[in-house]
Swiss-Prot record:
One of its GO terms (cellular component) is host cell nucleus. This is RxLR effector protein PexRD1. It comes from Phytophthora infestans (strain T30-4) (Potato late blight agent). A motif (RxLR-dEER) lies at residues 50-77. Belongs to the RxLR effector family. The gene is PexRD1.
Length: 213
């Protein structure tokens, strides 16, 4: 009997944890979508974007239940920030950056973002509740492009250092072709490493001019 009494609370706790996990996932969807004002349901986009824009769009599709649940849904959306971030601006920014990253990875243009955020196709919309978020997205894109450019520059420097190392080590053109998986002679413009091989040749020419100047 004592064993049964011990197992019962444990089962209740595990069941509660499962329920909380499901509820937490639901709350995350609501929280992210709540940061962008509702837009018309006629805007076509993928499911993930719709979740980010409006959780209620998937929850209240029944017109009969819309009136009954509108007030409850409104209260839930209002309480989400309190439950997760307590209205913390930094928390909201973090959620928005997740959305921005998703849209950036998906190749969303400024025009595409205007559509998602229900902004006019052109011009400023300073009084629109999503205008500030749109501007922040443009800043996010600029930041990401700079990061990509910096990373590309660092990668190029590393490649040049590697190529100079091969030259100093006495590797021949045949050796390097083998490293790149290229044929021993001739052009291979369709090979994915052909451009790298051409870069290697340019680096060797530049370096040899400096060494034997």
């Amino acid at each position: 009997m004592r064993a049964c009494n011990t197992l019962l609370p444990t089962a209740i706790v595990l069941t509660s944890c499962d329920a909380l996990s499901a509820h937490r996932a639901q709350i995350m969807n609501v929280a992210t979508s709540d940061l962008i004002s509702p837009i018309e349901s006629t805007v076509q986009d993928d499911n993930y974007d719709r979740q980010l824009r409006g959780f209620y769009a998937t929850e209240n599709t029944d017109p009969v239940n819309n009136q009954d649940t509108a007030h409850e849904d409104g209260e839930e959306r209002v309480n989400v920030a309190t439950v997760l971030g307590k209205g913390d601006e930094a928390w909201d920014d973090a959620l928005m950056r997740l959305a921005y990253q998703h849209w950036f990875d998906g190749g969303k243009t400024s025009d595409g973002m205007r559509l998602i955020m229900d902004l006019p196709a052109k011009g400023e919309a300073l009084r629109h509740p999503n205008w500030g978020k749109y501007i922040k997205y443009l800043e996010f894109v600029k930041e990401k492009k700079k990061e990509a450019a910096d990373a590309a520059a660092v990668a190029a420097l590393k490649r040049r250092r590697t190529y100079r190392g091969w030259y100093v080590d006495g590797k021949t053109e045949k050796d390097v072709r083998k490293i790149f998986g290229l044929p021993a002679t001739g052009k291979a413009k369709n090979h994915p490493n052909w451009a790298d091989f051409q870069e290697y040749l340019n680096v060797v020419r530049e370096y040899s001019k400096v060494v034997f100047k």
